[in-house]
Amino acid sequence: MYATLSSSQFLTMAGLMVVYILPPAGKETVIPIGIALGFPWWYMALSIAMIDVETGLFMTLNFDLAYKIPFLGPLLVDLTQKTERSIESHRWFAGLYFFAIMLFVMVPGLGSGGFRGAIAGRLLGMDTYPVLLAILAGALTGCFIIALGSAAVFSQLCINGLLPADISAIVCNRTL
């Protein structure tokens, strides 16, 4: 990213990424703000999706360490075992896990969707690669839907002159 942005744009983008990771801001907030600040919609979508995938990768690959945390580890082991028993009695439900994790990551919430999706996928007993693929698919789909929608709304607001003059000077003079 540093190679494709000026130093001030890079610092702004880094700030938006940090804000995305920390609640209460989510992708539904950060992507429109980035677009309003002049970043292309596709750049914002890819940047935020990258954060989801990176946090999902970290959590998925290191989730086994959570089983070793005192007090929390035994609770996670118990929850995972109950989930596995439930899956054995309802085998048809296991086929929906991929799409459930994808939807879980795609729908905006507090913080990174990759973090939540990785934990949910591993607690459901999914292997690492399907969890990562579901996170990737959900992050890209959700971020691109929000980015395209935000760019379309900003375009319509600018074309129709529905923004106040101060905000219009910032948002409408940028490339959408």
Model-found features: residue ranges?
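Membrane-interfacial helix-loop-helix
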Residues: M1-L16, L37-V107, T128-P130, L136, ...
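Generic detector of bulky aromatic hydrophobic side chains
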Residues: G26, L123, C172-N173
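Alpha-helical transmembrane segments and, especially, the helix-loop junctions at the ends
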Residues: K27-I31, T60, G114, C143-A151
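Transmembrane helix boundary and interhelical junction motifs in multipass membrane proteins
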Residues: I21-I33, P108-I119
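Mid-bilayer segments of alpha-helical transmembrane spans in multi-pass integral membrane proteins
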Residues: M106-G111, L140-F144
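Hydrophobic alpha-helical transmembrane segments and immediately flanking/interface helices
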Residues: L110-A137
